[in-house]
Each structure stands twice: as structure tokens, then as C-alpha cells.
């Protein structure tokens, strides 16, 4: 189950393998590994096999299959999938099921992808870790003693371990990029509006994005081609960029100006992480790219992000507050209480900071094609071997994933690409950011990073 999504789809379209065979292989992989990983909240074996069988019948009758023909796809459990659980990692929502597909899921199905199940996330996606009150914590395929990150925890773990070829995640503060960096896979947070949110849910925030996770930039680009595009049900959705992301991911250009920011803000990057990222930067320079180290002066954005994110969290649960106080984790309750207590003037000030950060980045993009940073400030965090949790998780946010916040505040695209491992064999991601609307440029440069570091084909031990 480590063939690329592109290879799987091509083989299914050409009849070299059936969609049902691919689906069964994915389900067997889940059965063999998920008792350890806990990537999936719900596996829809029956529905996946039925969908795969329909594709095989259609192909035999002459129907031309789509871009994602037979590709096994995992979906984060906060994204609606018709008939499947949508419990968002919370006891408050236990037993709830969706009665329709999200637009992005419908587009995946229309491209003949096969949804195999719902992946685990921390409660309401409030933290970048892999545990929730609903069950055992999701583990990192590279090391069961370390977090897979979050909040698209199960999605990244499933892709890294070969349980799925692609996954759909969400990102309000790094929730696609954090677990992708931790699990050694590619995660792309598109420009705000590139992938529509439809139907719009309560608590929707302009910091929240839908996006793809895959084992290569090419696979992520192929999925983005399918799920991107304007829809009238999301007023923030964008028209097509007018490019084919999959084609851009195959470009072999070796020119361009890259701004290298080893540190954004005040937090310090772990030496081991920094050395791995520096090796990637040197590889880019050796391949002809112009790399300029920058030390951008940016207004502190962490407080602004926390205000806007916690207001979003509060709006998600405001109609269920009594249940939240009774059933939810203290770390979620703390966020909700903060969000409920935020004053209107504080929101206005946070929005002003958002504009200032946006302007600061835009000035940089006048001189550079992309900005690259270490995705995370430290390697995947160690967890309790029994619970999969870490001590004092709230204290880690600024020290660990501070580099995630700016792209959510500004709506600019950002992609985490694996570039190597630490001395302890834990994955390290490099974040590639581009100006708003420039997803194609980010995909192009992310692919360049991938080629320069020769990561493709690297697998965790659980593989």
C-alpha cells in the first residue's frame, strides 16, 4: 500500500488491478496496523468495498474512470461524510452521524476516490496532539513513544503507515502541517477559499482550511486539483487558479528566489531540527536556487491567533456548554472559557494584527517567490507510553508550532514537506509559504524541495 496515488489510479483505470483489490489491500493494512496506531475512529469497510465494486463494474462497461480512480482516501472525523460518524474526538458528540457529504468529499467521490473511513483527531481539534476522550491516542508510525501531532492526527498517521494513499484534513492553526511534519508526509494548507467549506458549519472561521495530505507533493497536488474550485455555498471560495497542480509538481525548474527564515517570531528552533532544515537549504542552493536568509521583523501574532482561534472554539460548542463542562478535557474548556470572555475590542485588535502580519509578508513576496521555515520548532514530542499524552500540553504551543500561525492568520498557502530525520530518527518538515492565491507556486517549490532532499520512498519502521 505504498504505491503513489497517481500509480494506483493509473493501474485501476487501465485494468491492471481492480479497485476492489486496492480497497481490500488498504483494509488489510488497517487491520494489521491500527491496533497499534489508532489512526481510524471508524473504518467503513462495507461502504468502501461497495464503492470499489461499482467502479470496477463501471470500468468493465466502458466508463472512463476519474483522476482518483480506486485511490483509498481517509477523511478527518470533523468533515461530513454521508452516513458515517462525525464525533470530532469528543464525548459531547459521541454517536452523531452526518446526513450528507461535505462538498470536498463529494468531489473526491466524483473523481472516483474510495473513502475508507474517518480518522481520529483531538477533541474539536483544539490542540496539535493525538489524544482525545473517545479512545486510545493516535500514535506516530515512526515512534510509538512520540506524538503524531494534530489535529489531523489520524489522517497523517494513516498516510504515513500505508493505510491510505491520501487523506483530507483541516487546518485552523497548523492542523494539516503539524501532523504531516511529525509523520514524515506532505501536508498542504491551501489559500483560504481555494477549497470551499460547504455546507458551512457553525463556528466557521476565516482561519480554517480544508486540504490534502499525501506521501508526495505530486499526490497532494493531484488531490488539490480535484477538491479546489469555487462554489456558491461558500462566499469565501475562490475561482480556479487556472493551473494544473499535478503538472506543476512535475516541473524540474531550478531557478527562483527563496527567503529562508530559520526563525519566525521569538521562539527558538531545536538544533537538531535546524540542522536537518539547513541541509535541505544547502541542497536547494546546490541545485541552482537563490536562497537568502532573512530575519523578518513581524509583529507578535500569537496573541491574535489565540484570540481568534479560541473565539472559534467557543462558537463551535456554545450550544452544548453544559455538556462540554461535564464531559470535555480541561484544555478544551480553558480555550472555550477564554473565547467566551474575549471582548469586541480585543477581536478588533486581533484583526488589526492580522492585517499587519499580512502586510509584512506581502512586502517580502515583492522580493521572493516563497518563504521557507522549519515547520516545527522541535521534533515530535515524547508521550506517556500508556496514555499517549504529554505533560502540560498548553505550554508547548508557542515553543513547538509557532511557525504555523501566520499562514492561518493571513490565508496564504503553506505546505509542509519532509526533508529528513533527527538523530533519533524522527521526521523533520520544512514549511514552504507563498503569497495568497499562489498555491501553484507553493506546489512547484515544495516539489523542488522534495526532489533535492531525496525523501520519496522513505518509510517508518511500522511499514
Annotate each language-model stretch with its function:
Residues 32, 110, 160-266, 278-287, ...:
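Structural helix-boundary/capping segments
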Residues 91, 95, 237, 304, ...:
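Short, surface-exposed loop/helix-turn segments at secondary-structure junctions
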Amino acid at each position: 500500500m505504498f504505491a503513489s496515488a497517481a500509480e494506483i489510479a493509473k493501474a485501476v483505470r487501465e485494468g491492471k488491478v481492480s479497485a476492489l483489490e486496492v480497497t481490500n489491500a488498504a483494509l488489510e493494512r488497517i487491520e494489521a496496523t491500527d491496533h497499534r496506531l489508532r489512526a481510524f475512529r471508524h473504518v467503513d469497510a462495507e461502504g468502501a468495498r461497495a464503492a470499489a465494486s461499482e467502479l470496477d463494474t463501471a470500468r468493465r462497461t466502458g466508463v472512463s474512470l476519474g483522476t482518483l480512480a480506486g485511490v483509498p482516501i481517509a477523511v478527518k472525523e470533523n468533515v461530513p461524510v454521508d452516513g458515517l460518524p462525525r464525533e470530532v474526538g469528543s464525548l459531547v458528540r459521541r454517536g452523531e452521524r452526518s446526513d450528507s457529504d461535505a462538498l470536498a468529499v463529494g468531489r473526491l467521490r466524483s473523481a472516483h476516490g474510495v473513502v475508507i473511513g474517518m480518522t481520529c483527531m483531538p477533541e474539536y481539534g483544539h490542540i496539535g496532539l493525538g489524544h482525545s476522550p473517545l479512545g486510545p491516542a493516535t500514535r506516530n508510525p515512526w515512534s510509538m513513544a512520540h506524538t503524531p501531532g494534530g489535529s489531523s492526527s489520524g489522517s497523517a498517521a494513516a498516510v504515513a503507515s500505508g493505510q491510505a494513499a491520501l487523506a483530507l484534513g483541516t487546518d485552523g492553526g497548523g492542523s494539516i502541517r503539524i501532523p504531516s511534519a511529525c509523520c514524515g508526509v506532505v501536508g498542504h494548507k491551501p489559500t483560504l477559499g481555494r477549497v470551499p467549506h460547504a455546507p458551512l458549519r457553525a463556528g466557521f472561521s476565516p482561519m480554517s482550511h480544508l486540504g490534502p495530505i499525501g506521501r508526495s507533493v505530486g499526490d497532494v497536488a493531484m488531490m488539490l486539483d480535484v477538491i479546489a474550485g469555487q462554489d456558491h455555498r461558500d462566499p469565501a471560495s475562490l475561482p480556479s487558479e487556472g493551473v494544473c497542480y499535478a503538472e506543476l509538481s512535475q516541473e524540474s525548474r531550478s531557478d527562483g528566489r527563496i527567503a529562508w527564515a530559520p526563525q519566525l517570531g521569538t521562539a527558538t528552533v531545536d538544533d537538531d531540527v535546524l540542522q536537518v532544515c539547513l541541509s535541505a537549504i544547502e541542497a536547494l542552493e546546490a541545485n541552482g536556487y537563490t536562497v537568502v536568509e532573512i530575519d523578518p521583523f513581524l509583529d507578535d501574532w500569537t496573541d491574535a491567533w489565540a484570540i481568534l482561534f479560541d473565539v472559534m472554539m467557543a462558537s463551535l460548542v456554545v450550544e452544548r456548554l453544559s455538556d462540554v463542562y461535564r464531559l470535555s478535557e480541561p484544555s478544551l474548556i480553558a480555550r472555550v472559557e477564554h473565547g467566551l470572555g474575549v471582548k469586541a475590542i480585543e477581536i478588533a485588535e486581533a484583526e488589526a494584527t492580522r492585517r499587519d502580519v499580512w502586510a509584512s509578508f506581502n512586502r517580502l513576496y515583492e522580493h521572493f517567490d516563497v518563504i521557507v521555515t522549519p515547520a516545527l520548532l522541535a521534533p515530535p514530542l515524547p508521550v506517556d507510553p500508556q496514555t499517549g499524552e504529554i505533560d502540560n500540553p498548553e505550554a508547548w504551543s508557542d515553543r513547538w508550532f509557532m511557525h504555523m500561525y501566520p499562514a492561518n492568520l493571513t490565508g496564504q498557502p503553506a505546505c509542509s514537506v519532509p526533508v529528513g530525520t533527527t538523530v533519533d530518527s524522527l521526521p523533520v518538515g520544512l514549511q514552504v509559504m507563498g503569497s495568497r492565491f499562489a498555491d501553484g507556486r507553493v506546489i512547484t517549490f515544495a516539489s523542488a524541495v522534495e526532489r533535492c532532499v531525496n525523501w520519496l520512498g522513505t518509510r517508518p519502521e511500522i511499514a
